[in-house]
Swiss-Prot record:
Residues 574-687 form the C2 domain. This is Ras GTPase-activating protein 1. The keyword Acetylation applies. Sequence repeats lie at residues 646-664, 665-683. SUPFAM superfamilies: C2 domain (Calcium/lipid-binding domain, CaLB), GTPase activation domain, GAP, PH domain-like, SH2 domain, SH3-domain. Residues 1-160 are annotated as: Hydrophobic. GO terms for cellular component: cytoplasm. The gene is RASA1. Pfam families: C2, PH, RasGAP, SH2, SH3_1.
Length: 1044
């Protein structure tokens, strides 16, 4: 309260805590009423005038007492003033040693003997009283600590963070204590070293990148570290974390998270003098925004702070009158000079009116509790706050201080805005609070009225907002993982000049980002399909700060899209860049790792019932296995990690126990340095496990892992010409030999061969020849293609690579309907809920099957013609081998199309990118029943005694058998190999280098084989000779050039 009176008996008690009891008392910090005996000899400066409390002709008494924030009374210290109570009034002061008093409420009063002036006391608010001590750091969990854990249902929220700005209440010193404006690195380092304390910091505008900022920090090792801060459309990004202000960024790294390991921001370093370098502009014409854009409407005379100068004359600004942010165009504004008051544009500031005009405004436009601020007439540089009560108008002086604060009534604030905010909550005069400011009137605006508005508006209409980001290397939509299991489709721009990945809600609103990632401090890692149960995922890991890993997850619609984005991002990631002079343009080097998690032995019974493994590269999780039962689980799962970032030096595997919790803790772990593995050779080893938790004498067990680490040195394509020619020979002697010696590397071999033959448009030769060989070697029609061979693996990979559009067209609508439905299709008596109607469930299942099968039958033309030609070749081959088996031509195609493509997509639609989220238990069960029914239809088999509850589907199978036969026959009805214009997107040099690496790894087996095989002997010996020659050339490249 700014005006109050109280009387007290000389030497009597002081009472603190009148109106309202006070916030501090309510919190239990100290009693609402505190009594302290004041000596009678206390000198009082009440008779002295208080300049700054009331200006001529206006009565106002201001209070400057203090509330004790620590919750106790200490002799000799009040509100942080050692030695007694300090009261300041225009140079007059009174202090008493060893006396303490506390006021407990907004209405509290302190009474002094022999005085008529009352000094009301108030609890500290934001900026009130003497500068308060900073609050203790919030007790928050450390972000991004160590190895993350996940549950089987893709809850990876631990190491991940969202694009939303940090929403934790943050406190920071005032801007003028740490912001230095435009400053070069050398001077920044000098100022920090002069401060002499580790933990000292400042923020400066970058001298190298105008418009961006740098946080300079003196570490415990006496090294000055510089952290880039990107300013974009009013937000501030460091690494990838977004803040709405630089003050919030300072508060976060002061109280919540470390900037370097174990080091937070501690001591702000102030500039030699205050810095006000923000560009300000004023509207010379009014403007109304275009709907559904990021533009803002404004009035003539509105003042703006410019945050970003975008392309084609657009600017991102804050309107000081409305606090609204958005786009304006420079044609509608004029520059505001440095000489103009920095408060110009605030809705409450009136810099061009006289004292009398201020009175008139408040009396005519304002109401009781209205206010405005204008420059002081008596003291240049000071300000006066004019406040209207129901009876009169009062004025209060606001004085800037040498330490860049503002004083009003003996209290210090970081800004005039803080003063206004304070007295919106606290009484400024007894019974009154600040409410609505009186805005500037039209007659106050000093503008050039001779502006040709018509021409300017016409110019604006011709401007485009499509080119805000000029150096766009890549753009398009990607899925980004949000909290929990949500994936959202967002619009991304890869900006090349500043190495930034910027993303937006949509392409239409691609102005203010939803988020921004500074790629210069990032690395890109692959994400295996197993981690989220969906393909085409990758992650960007921020690795520049103390938080070990800061992760963003993304997914492409297709493997090609994900690969394109990863390659584009890697080119701008700091960790992927070669040092000058270390790279050889003629020789590339790519590392890959294949892990087979085989089994575990003697896991602790107490801790494991359903164990699964989490796989990390360094400390970044990239994959996980399924959960298995027991203490000796067998997984036999393969994980391929291609094109590893160059900083990867180890893999880690942790073991967790699957529970119903959202996250399962890591219990056991093993680590293996890649340098231990012989390059190009498979290692099969039992690793002893270590424990994250005390096992109390129990042995942790062991884990069997097969690992193959390869480092491909890729030479120019012409070096592989003879090698390629030998592989592509139509007899496929090299392919047959490699399939014989590469049993454990079958999947890798198939992937490499398919890419090479696709590039040469010879995939049909490869697949048809291998399929024919498989058919010729099989005696029993019923077991054809049941085993996993190179031929079946190649067919499966080929379908997944080329038939995605067919799968989506045939299945997506029905699967989405299943996902949305709450109706069960359960038919099994053991799984039916109580009172559940099986007939209703069956009708729902048959309805789904009818819709789904109809879509599949109608989608035959969408299958790639080359794949259909291969199906036709299969049909001809089996007809020739088993001429009397009339169903074989149908079943050989269904075995691939349904068993290896359509039914797996129905069972796990996330793996085929049909859905983003995991299906509910009802939906998952429905998908299983649908897949079983479709597979039986494709096999032309009805349900029988094994699953009698499914017999209700048999009429559907019978009625659709003939259509299924016609559909499968039609798929193979492409008698001639079609011409294709599609160009393969493979990296031929790398694929040839990878195949050469396999030949080197299996050279001993190939040499043995070359001595046994008659017809292949010549070809295999030539292969061995070429393999050796390529190895010698590779060594020559390595010796003559340093390869990173």
């Amino acid at each position: 309260m700014m005006a109050a009176e109280a009387g007290g008996e000389e030497g009597g008690p002081v009472t603190a805590g009148a109106a309202g009891g006070g916030a501090a008392a309510a919190s239990g910090a100290y009693p609402a009423v505190c009594r302290v005996k004041i000596p009678a000899a206390l000198p009082v400066a009440a008779a002295a005038p208080f300049p700054g409390l009331a200006e001529a002709g206006v009565a106002a008494t201001l209070g400057g007492g203090a509330a004790l924030g620590s919750g106790f009374l200490g002799a000799g210290s009040v509100a942080g003033t050692p030695g007694g109570v300090g009261l300041s009034a225009g140079g007059a002061a009174a202090g008493v040693a060893g006396v303490a008093a506390a006021a407990a409420g907004a209405g509290g009063e302190m009474a002094f003997a022999k005085g008529t002036t009352s000094l009301p006391t108030e609890t500290f608010g934001a900026g009130g009283g003497f500068p308060p001590l900073p609050p203790p750091p919030p007790q928050l969990p450390t972000l991004g600590a160590g190895l993350g854990t996940v549950d089987e249902g893709d809850s990876l929220d631990g190491p991940e963070y969202e694009e939303e700005e940090v929403a934790i209440p943050l406190t920071a010193p005032p801007t003028n204590q740490w912001y230095h404006g435009k400053l070069d690195r050398t001077i920044a380092e000098e100022r920090l070293r002069q401060a002499g304390k580790s933990g000292s910091y400042l923020i400066r505008e970058s001298d190298r990148r105008p418009g961006s900022f740098v946080l300079s920090f003196l570490s415990q090792t006496n090294v000055v570290n510089h952290f880039r801060i990107i300013a974009m459309c009013g937000d501030y990004y460091i690494g990838g974390r977004r803040f709405s202000s630089l003050s919030d960024l300072i508060g976060y790294y002061s109280h919540v998270s470390c900037l370097l390991k174990g080091e937070k921001l501690l001591y702000p370093v102030a500039p030699p003098e205050p810095v006000e370098d923000r560009r300000r502009v004023r509207a010379i014409l009014p403007y109304t925004k275009v709907p559904d854009t990021d533009e803002i409407s404004f009035l003539k005379g509105d003042m703006f702070i410019v945050h970003n100068e975008l392309e084609d004359g657009w600017m991102w600004v804050t309107n000081l009158r409305t606090d609204e942010q958005g786009l304006i165009v420079e044609d509608l504004v004029e520059e505001v000079g440095r000489e103009e008051d920095p408060h110009e544009g605030k809705i409450w500031f009136h810099g061009k009116i006289s004292k009398q005009e201020a009175y008139n405004l408040l009396m005519t436009v304002g109401q009781a509790c209205s206010f405005l601020v204008r420059p002081s007439d008596n003291t240049p540089g000071d300000y006066s706050l004019y406040f209207r009560t129901s009876e009169n108008i009062q004025r209060f002086k606001i004085c800037p201080t040498p330490n860049n604060q503002f004083m009003m009534g003996g209290r210090y604030y970081n800004s005039i805005g803080d003063i206004i905010d304070h007295y919106r909550k606290e009484q400024i005069v007894e019974g009154y609070y600040l409410k609505e400011p009186v805005p500037m009137q039209d007659q106050e605006q000093v503008l050039n009225d001779a502006v040709d508005g018509k021409e300017i508006y016409n110019t604006i209409r011709r401007k485009t907002k499509d080119a805000f980001y000029k150096n766009i290397v890549k753009k398009g939509y990607l899925l980004k993982k949000g909290k929990g299991k949500r994936w959202k489709n967002l619009y991304f721009i890869l900006e090349g000049s500043d190495a930034q990945l910027i993303y937006f809600e949509s392409e239409k609103r691609a102005t203010k980002p939803k988020g921004l990632i500074d790629l210069s401090v990032c690395s890109v890692y692959v994400v295996h399909d197993s981690l989220f149960g969906r393909p085409n995922c990758f992650q960007i890991v921020v690795q520049h700060f103390s938080e070990e890993h800061y992760i963003f997850y993304f997914a492409g619609e297709t493997p090609e899209q994900a690969e394109d984005w990863m390659k584009g991002l890697q080119a701008f990631c700091n960790l992927r860049k070669s040092s000058p002079g270390t790279s050889n343009k003629r020789l590339r080097q790519v590392s890959s790792l294949i892990l087979h998690i085989e089994e575990a032995h003697k896991l602790p019974v107490k801790h494991f019932t359903n164990p699964y493994c989490n796989i990390y590269l360094n400390s970044v999780q990239v994959a996980k296995t399924h959960a298995r039962e027991g203490q000796n689980p067998v997984w036999s799962e393969e994980f391929v990690f291609d094109d590893l970032p160059p900083d990867i030096n180890r893999f880690e595997i942790t073991l967790s126990n699957k529970t119903k919790k959202s996250k399962d803790p890591d219990i056991l772990f093993m680590r293996c340095q890649l340098s231990r593995l012989q390059k190009g050779h498979a290692t099969d080893e039992w690793f002893l496990l270590s424990s994250h938790i005390p096992l109390k004498g129990i042995e942790p067990g062991s884990l069997r892992v097969r690992a193959r680490y390869s480092m491909e040195k890729i030479m120019p394509e012409e070096e592989y010409s003879e090698f390629k020619e030998l592989i592509l020979q139509k007899e496929l002697h090299v392919v047959y030999a490699l399939s014989h010696v590469c049993g454990q590397d079958r999947t890798l071999l198939a992937s490499i061969l398919l890419k090479i033959f696709l590039h040469e448009k010879l995939e049909s030769l490869l697949l048809c020849t291998l399929n024919d060989r498989e058919i010729s070697m099989e005696d029993e029609a019923t077991t054809l293609f049941r085993a996993t061979t190179l031929a079946s693996t190649l067919m499966e990979q080929s379908m997944k690579a080329t038939a995605t559009q067919f799968v989506h067209h045939a299945l997506k609508d029905s699967i989405l309907r299943i996902m949305e439905s709450k109706q069960s299709c359960e038919l099994s008596p053991s799984k039916l809920e109580k009172n559940e109607d099986v007939n209703t469930n069956l009708a729902h299942l048959l309805n789904i099957l009818s819709e789904l099968v109809e879509k599949i039958f109608m989608a035959s033309e969408i299958l790639p013609p080359t794949l259909r030609y291969i199906y036709g070749c299969l049909q001809k081959s089996v007809q020739h081998k088993w001429p009397t088996n009339t169903t074989m031509r149908t079943r050989v195609v269904s075995g691939f199309v349904f068993l290896r493509l359509i039914c797996p997509a129905i069972l796990n639609p996330r793996m085929f990118n049909i859905i983003s989220d995991s299906p509910s238990p009802i939906a998952a069960r429905t998908l299983t029943l649908v897949a079983k029914s479709v597979q039986n239809l494709a096999n032309l088999v009805e349900f029988g005694a094994k699953e009698p509850y499914m017999e209700g589907v048999n009429p559907f199978i019978k009625s659709n058998k003939h259509r299924m036969i016609m559909f499968l026959d039609e798929l193979g009805n492409v008698p001639e190999l079609p011409d294709t214009t599609e160009h393969s997107r493979t990296d031929l040099c790398r694929d040839l280098a990878a195949l050469h690496e396999i030949c080197v790894a299996h050279s001993d087996e190939l040499r043995t084989l070359s001595n046994e095989r008659g017809a292949q002997q010549h070809v295999l010996k030539k292969l061995l000779a070429i393999t050796e020659l390529l190895q010698q050339k590779q060594n020559q490249y390595t010796k003559t050039n340093d390869v990173r």
